[in-house]
Amino acid sequence: MKQNYCPKTIEPYVQSIWKKKNTFKVTENSNKEKFYCLAMIPYPSGKLHMGHVRNYTISDVIARYQRMLGKNVLHPMGWDAFGLPAENAAIKNNTHPAQWTYENIKYMKQQLISLGLSYDWDREITTCKPEYYQWEQWFFIELYKKNLVYKKKSWVNWCEYDKTVLANEQVINELCWRCNNKVIKKKIFQWFIKITKYAEELLNDLDNLPEWPEKVKTMQHNWIGRNHGIKIKLKLANQHTILNDVFISKPSTLMGATFITLSPSHELSFKIARKKHKIQEFIENCSSNTNTYNDINNTNIGINTNEFALHPITKKKLPIWITNYVLSDYDTNSILCVPAHNQHDLNFAIKYNLKIKAVILNLDGTEPKIKNTAMTSMGKLFNSNQYNNLNYQEGSYRIIQDLENNHIGKKITYYRLRDWSISRQRYWGAPIPMAVLENKKNVPIPKQYLPIILPETIPFKNIKPLSNNILLKKIYIDEKIAICESDTFDTFLESSWYYARFTCNNFHKGMISQKLANYWLPVDQYIGGIEHAVMHLIYFRFVHKLLRDLGLVYSNEPVKKLLCQGMVLSDAFYYFDHNKQKQWISAKSITIKYDSNHKIQSHFYSNNKKIFHAGMIKMSKSKFNGIEPEDIIKKYGTDTIRLFIMFAAPVESALEWKESGVKGIHKFLKKLWVLSYNHIKLYNHKIKLRINLFTEQQQHIYSELHKTIKIVSQYITDTQSFNVAISKIMKFSNTLMSISLKNEQNQALMQESLLAVIQMLYPFIPHFSFAIWEFLSPKKENIDFISWPKYNFKAILSKLKYTIIIQINGKKRHKILALKNSSQEKILEIILNENKIKKYLNNKPIQKIIYIPNKILNLVI
């Protein structure tokens, strides 16, 4: 063992052993408790960023810890490899997206290996390979057979920049989630999977996920959005036409309805538009709008049709408006609006000066004064004719009863969740395994043709969607010519089932091996960002239920425990150019100025520019505040990064990147290395720990050792407070640095303490721990197969030795160390032979002995 810590030599050495021995390969073992640890796999964009490093370090720490607990751990890695970035890069660089993707995978895989991550690389998955997506195509056909898939022309979110459809979950503030460009509405044919069939189950089963973050469950609950209400038939004024299925969410407020809103695609909207040019123009303009009825803060606009419907009870005329915020394909594409008691409706009514009528009293019985805020309390009904003075629930019941008795209304439950649009109009994705016959009928492609493989010989100078690629167009089905579907799958479909394929990635007889999948599933620990709460994390719960209903998996949910790690932040800086436009600038390009408290100044001058400090914000390429993991590894080593990431903040919180903190961690590792080196050089393994010979200091350290093992175990297992666990290990390690190694029992205590410290640090800093363990362990074992240390209850719950105060005639004269609960005779045997006590006794007879065990012995002479 070398005297100084040198990660540049240690880490490659340890990694080479792991590779040679295939240390982390795992197979099914019914004699061991299984543990499946999985982090969301990356898109092979080119390089890992610090967010990746944090995510995968967390999962690796958990996986290594669970192995030390004796569990059979599956910890796989793969690549979510289809998608627009590869296609756009291919266009830009005149290359094939496959080539770009596989080159990135090769580079990023080496980066992951350099981080010391304990993956079973034999289970690696790449989702753009036919051997993966062929089973996705098979799966889609099975869903089609079960009537869970359909194609229809519908309004979709369209990204003009990327020329493709976006799911509702992929539109954020009317912008594309990926490219941040404006999203418009467009009507095209799309394939859908009926996720709405599972809406109730997806919602209810959130209650069966006690180890998921409440925030994620709340986000999913709101996204699925279960609502109750009634649908009503209304007569149009001066016409015999019936307006069907007009929705109101709170029946008790029906008497306060003052107008009706329709979606632009409502049948009546089109009928009116045929006669009125301005309305036709308005409907066309709405196609570029992505507002929804749930977007309270968005700009909602409407147009008066000058048509009226009759209130179902009062028969008063209600004006009909067409608006941009009623969803086109929603169950509620016509709404009976009650502005006094609904904020959406109130905002619209105020904007267009529509009537506002309150019909529910405040809880104190007073009439509400409606200005800018709707009244939503559940008081008594008033201003409601025959329903006056009924309480809220009774009023709702009576109104529903009257509507149903008159056959003009019925109770319904609907969901905000929409069916999943899985068609994408791009090349780099899995082809949808459907075709169109000459009679326009959609048919699944026969299984013998699967997989439908992307044409790879096309020139990529002018890459186009599959609809423009003649190599994929024609196929014969039952001797009939069929035109292949030109759309590809939404890449969220690939990422919705890799967790299951990891359990059996070399299984060739089907999508999933039931035997292997049901040994490993559900995933015990899943790690990923909370930004996936209403996209990936809903989709893969849904797909798991589909797999269950196909008989491929047994559990109802794919994951037991979810951890959403926080973002990684770093300092960002900007200046204003001559056009007064904000320009972000890298910290490497400026000289940062600090104030008297060593904090970065809010603004300062560098290179003749006034530089502003934006504070700690999320690392990103656009802000030039990213930190390259490779640079930090070269400077400090992988283990330093790993330990800093796990120590600097709770895993679910944002982590502020500070190189001063990295330096502090590196300094700690160097000190611990030197301490271990000095001990190993002196220690003779024949020296045994003899607790009965401990001094008070040794006893204290021994007790602290076992307290540390206990509390670190609790922090990791119970609350995943890894940062607190590390701080406890560091605190105890610093205690060890004060021990003199000249005393044999000190050496024995140091040996036992260092063994435990290195074991506890192993999940965090595996290279460092591996290298020291080779020399520290008496049997020269491999730490990769060592168990987590166990603590001694006796050492924690009670002291092994106590200080006994010796008094003579009530005055303190001496103190000794004695084992707990030592007898009076034993204490006397010790002290009566000591010269100090003999001097005070001066040969006088002892008249009385007062002994309080573990505290005081008083001799009365």
Curated annotation (Swiss-Prot):
Binding site for ATP: K621
Gene3D superfamilies listed in its UniProt record: 2.20.28.290, 3.10.20.590, HUPs, Isoleucyl-tRNA Synthetase, Domain 1
Cellular component terms per the entry's GO annotation: cytosol
InterPro entries assigned: aa-tRNA-synth_I_CS (IPR001412), aa-tRNA-synth_Ia (IPR002300), Leu-tRNA-ligase (IPR002302), Leu_tRNA-synth_edit (IPR025709), M/V/L/I-tRNA-synth_anticd-bd (IPR013155), Methionyl/Leucyl_tRNA_Synth (IPR015413), Rossmann-like_a/b/a_fold (IPR014729), tRNAsynth_Ia_anticodon-bd (IPR009080)
Entry-linked Pfam families: Anticodon_1 (PF08264), tRNA-synt_1 (PF00133), tRNA-synt_1_2 (PF13603), tRNA-synt_1g (PF09334)
UniProt keyword 4Fe-4S, yes or no: no
Reaction catalyzed: tRNA(Leu) + L-leucine + ATP = L-leucyl-tRNA(Leu) + AMP + diphosphate
Record bears the keyword Cytoplasm: yes
BP GO annotations: leucyl-tRNA aminoacylation
Family listed: Belongs to the class-I aminoacyl-tRNA synthetase family.
Protein name, UniProt field: Leucine--tRNA ligase
